[in-house]
Structure formats: structure tokens, C-alpha cells
Curated annotation (Swiss-Prot):
Inducing factors: In liver, expression is induced by the environmental contaminant 2,3,7,8-tetrachlorodibenzo-p-dioxin (TCDD); the induction is mediated by AHR.
Transmembrane segments: 74-94, 112-132, 136-156, 171-191, 196-216, 258-278, 302-322, 325-345, 348-368, 382-402, 411-431
One MF term in the entry's GO annotations: symporter activity
Gene for this chain: Slc46a3
Keywords (A to Z) from UniProt: Glycoprotein, Lysosome, Membrane, Signal, Symport, Transmembrane, Transmembrane helix, Transport
GO cellular component assignments: lysosomal membrane
SUPFAM superfamilies: MFS general substrate transporter (SSF103473)
Function: Lysosomal proton-coupled steroid conjugate and bile acid transporter. Preferentially recognizes lipophilic steroid conjugates or bile acis as endogenous substrates and seems to mediate escape from lysosomes to the cytoplasm. Modulates hepatic cytosolic copper homeostasis, maybe acting as a lysosomal copper transporter and sequestering copper ions in the lysosome. Delivers pathogen-associated molecular patterns to cytosolic pattern recognition receptors as part of the innate immune response to microbes.
The organism of origin for this protein: Mus musculus (Mouse)
Pfam families associated with the record: MFS_1 (PF07690)
Residue ranges, Cytoplasmic side: 95-111, 157-170, 217-257, 323-324, 369-381, 432-460
Membrane topology, as annotated: Multi-pass membrane protein
Protein name: Lysosomal proton-coupled steroid conjugate and bile acid symporter SLC46A3
Major place of residence: membrane
């Protein structure tokens, strides 16, 4: 008997993702450190020692390693750009007809393959450049954005009422906060006690369990239409995907089109900043003046993951007295404050305290997705989230690539510049939300926008 709870799959995937990201960042950093010079990599939790060596050769060596690590991350992200965009769009858009499980399974297979390859690389000490090839192949199956987009569409399929949907999403954010927080907190101990090989092996095992759950236990609310599958060729199916995405923006009133474009722009730009700055935090903490070890990196990652929990509480509390758009404003402005403070942080204590303004970072992502889901028909949810996931994949890859390039160019003269740039970029989604407000977004008006649409978008 199959069940309809997507939460276990999301939490297992979140564990694997939260553990893999800091593992890979530190693995790449250490490999480049070892290949760049003759200095022995030592884990130091004392930032003052890092400060005292600013005039020595080790300080220049650290900066060189930071530059090389940033540029290598740029190459890795660029290798996943094209295959990630194509696979994400096709898998999620086709999920309206073929079910939500297909993109979940394929993206999990891609993650499993990448983690298995990282395990082999760390065990056999294979050339680091092979990571670029494995990332390219893994992106052909989708990525984390593909998985999350399919999961969100799955929840929308099940929860037809908006209030039930937002409660379930908020509870899921709470659970994600607990899982990612504990995983981030323990990631440093995984590296210290088990090493990279066993850490990647554990991640691969978790992904295998997740695949088994999705394949054998998870029910799919979208039933496949066998007649459509038989009569449509691959080319026709691809044309249908583009057609339904085109109709997503064409159908409805001009107000609905404007709201849809503005909300997507707001979500994508905010996502661009949040995803782009995430790996920079790790590089910034590894280098001077902080020089954190793997345990401190884990603490920082755990504090960053607390935003899932605090965002859940924020949505739950603010929803009683504020509208969705105002909740999104709070998340954007508090994140902007956090970015500005991070630019001037030079001590370990301050770096931990800087995480406080980031407590509502996830709120805009959850709220904006919910606002978007209210603007379109239930039959367009797959096309909508395929479009969002496509743009998020594009934004995610370009942001990490751009941020890595900018950080490598500015780390020598001012490492905190990238945080000030992020704070400035967050002005754009704030302005976009002002435009949404001026157009006339009101709570409850989204229902009218949906009913305004004709039913031309459905496939014959």
C-alpha cells in the first residue's frame, strides 16, 4: 500500500544536500591547498593566529588558495548550467501529465551518482578536474532545484485549499530547519571523525534509501494519461511543454500577467542572491581573518539552517496580523541587514552574531511560491513550477559562478565586498514587490485572477 507523505523524501534529500555542500566545499579547498604549495593543512579554531600572520607568506598563500577555489567552483557550476536548465524544465513541465515522481527519481539518481563519484575521488585521490565531468553528467538527470520543484507541485496537487497548503509548507519548513540545522552542526564532526570518504558514503546510502521510498512507497497524485503518451511523439511532447508554458503567461488579464511576471522576477532575484552567497560564506570563513576549522564551519552552517525553523515561526506568527506581501518584505529587509553586517565582520563572535538577522531568510521564498501558486489554475501548477525551477536553476548556476568570480577578484583588497553587493542587489526584489503592491495585490484577489482565465491552456 502506497502513502501520500512527501515529507520523508524531502527530509532525506535535505540531509544529503546539507551534508554534501559543506563537504564538497572543504574537500575542494583542501585539495587545492595541498596542490598549490608545501604548507600542511592544519585545522585552527583560533582566529587570532590567523590575524597575526597577515604579513607572512602563509597569508598570501591563503589568498591564492581562496582565488583558486573560487575559480574552480566557477568551472564546476558552469559545467552544470546547460544540462541542468534543459533537464529541469523538461522534467517538471512534463510532470503535469506523467506524474511528479519522475523528476524526483531522476534528480535523486543524479545526486547519487555525483556523491558516489566524490566518494571514489576522495578514496583514490583522483584528479580534481574529474569533478567537473561528474557534475555535468549528474545535471543531465536534474538537480536539487528539480527535486524541490516536483515536491512543491506534489503538495499543491494534494492541498487544494490555500490555508491547508500554506500550513503544510510552513510545517515542512520547520522540519527542514531541524534536519538541516542538525546536519550542518554535525558536518564538521563527520569530516573530523569519519573523513571525506565515509561521509560521502553515508550520503550516498541516504540517497539510496530516499530512492527506495519514492519508487516503492510514495503515491503519485497525478495519474498518467496512457492515451496521450501513446499518441504524442518526443518532438510533439516537447512542443507541448513550451506551449503550456507560453499559455501560462498569455492567458488571463493583463493584471494577472503583470503579477505573474513581477512575482517570478522577485523570487528569482532573491533566489539569485541567497544561493550565490551561500558558498561564499564557507570560503570567507575558511580564509583570513577567521580561518575556521571544519567544526566551526559546521556551527556556522547550523546557524544558517536555523532560518528554516525561524522562518516557519515567522510565517505562523506574522500571518495572523500581516499580509503575504508584508511578510516577504520583512524577510528581504532583515536579510539585507545581515549582508551589510557580514561585510564588516572580522571576528568569530561577530560572525556568529551576524547570523541573527538571517533568521527570516527563507520566508520570502516560501511566501512568494505560495503567492504564485494562487495566480494560476491547478492544471498549470506543473508548468508554473517548471518555469520557476528553470529560472532558479539558471539563477543558481549563474549566481554561484558570478559570485565565485567576483569573490576571487575582490578577496585580495576587500573580502567583504561581495556581501555589500548582495545587500545592494536585494533592493531589486524590494522594488518589485512595491510594484506588485501598486498594481493592486490584495489577499483574496488571487481567486478572481484564476477564475478570469479561460480553459484554453489545457492540452487536447
Amino acid at each position: 500500500m502506497k502513502i501520500s507523505f512527501i515529507e520523508p523524501a524531502i527530509l532525506l534529500n535535505a540531509f544529503a544536500m546539507t551534508l554534501t555542500i559543506p563537504l564538497t566545499a572543504q574537500y575542494v579547498y583542501r585539495r587545492i591547498w595541498e596542490e598549490t604549495g608545501n604548507y600542511t593543512f592544519a585545522s585552527n579554531s583560533n582566529g587570532s593566529e590567523c590575524d597575526q600572520n597577515k604579513s607572512s607568506s602563509i597569508f598570501a598563500f591563503r589568498e591564492e588558495v581562496q582565488k583558486k577555489a573560487s575559480l574552480f567552483n566557477l568551472q564546476v557550476e558552469m559545467s552544470a548550467l546547460i544540462p541542468g536548465l534543459v533537464s529541469t524544465f523538461m522534467l517538471l513541465a512534463s510532470s503535469d501529465n506523467h506524474g511528479r515522481k519522475l523528476p524526483m527519481v531522476l534528480s535523486s539518481l543524479g545526486s547519487l551518482g555525483t556523491n558516489t563519484w566524490l566518494c571514489m575521488m576522495s578514496y583514490f585521490d583522483l584528479p580534481l578536474q574529474l569533478l567537473i565531468a561528474s557534475t555535468f553528467i549528474g545535471a543531465l538527470f536534474g538537480n536539487y532545484t528539480t527535486f524541490w520543484g516536483a515536491c512543491f507541485a506534489y503538495i499543491v496537487d494534494q492541498q487544494k485549499e490555500y490555508k491547508h497548503r500554506i500550513i503544510r509548507i510552513a510545517i515542512l519548513d520547520f522540519m527542514l530547519g531541524v534536519v538541516t540545522g542538525l546536519t550542518g552542526l554535525s558536518s564538521g564532526y563527520f569530516i573530523r571523525e569519519l573523513g571525506f570518504v565515509w561521509s560521502y558514503f553515508i550520503t550516498a546510502m541516504v540517497l539510496i534509501v530516499n530512492l527506495a521510498y519514492i519508487l516503492f512507497f510514495l503515491n503519485d497524485p497525478i495519474k498518467e494519461s496512457s492515451s496521450q503518451i501513446v499518441t504524442m511523439s518526443c518532438i510533439e511532447s516537447l512542443k507541448d511543454l513550451f506551449y503550456r508554458t507560453y499559455m501560462l503567461f498569455k492567458n488571463g488579464s493583463s493584471k494577472r500577467q503583470a503579477l505573474l511576471c513581477l512575482l517570478i522576477f522577485t523570487l528569482v532575484i532573491y533566489f539569485f542572491v541567497i544561493i550565490g552567497i551561500s558558498p561564499i560564506f564557507t570560503l570567507y570563513e575558511l580564509g583570513p581573518p577567521l580561518c575556521w576549522n571544519e567544526v566551526y564551519i559546521g556551527y556556522g552552517s547550523a546557524l544558517g539552517s536555523v532560518s528554516f525553523l525561524s522562518s516557519f515561526l515567522g510565517i505562523w506568527l506574522f500571518s495572523y496580523c500581516l499580509k503575504d506581501i508584508h511578510i516577504a518584505y520583512i524577510g528581504i529587509f532583515t536579510t539585507m541587514v545581515g549582508m551589510t553586517l557580514a561585510a564588516f565582520t572580522r571576528t568569530t563572535l561577530m560572525m556568529f552574531l551576524v547570523r541573527i538577522p538571517f533568521i527570516f531568510t527563507i520566508m520570502p521564498l516560501s511566501v512568494l511560491r505560495s503567492m504564485l501558486s494562487k495566480v494560476v489554475h491547478s492544471t498549470e501548477q506543473g508548468a508554473l513550477f517548471a518555469c520557476i525551477a528553470f529560472l532558479e536553476t539558471l539563477a543558481g548556476v549563474t549566481s554561484t559562478s558570478a559570485y565565485s568570480g567576483i569573490y576571487s577578484a575582490t578577496v585580495a583588497w576587500y573580502p567583504g565586498f561581495i556581501f555589500l553587493l548582495s545587500a545592494g542587489l536585494l533592493v531589486l526584489p524590494a522594488i518589485s514587490l512595491c510594484c506588485v503592491k501598486s498594481i493592486g495585490w490584495e489577499e483574496g484577489s488571487y481567486t478572481l485572477l484564476v477564475h478570469e482565465e479561460p480553459s484554453e491552456h489545457t492540452s487536447d
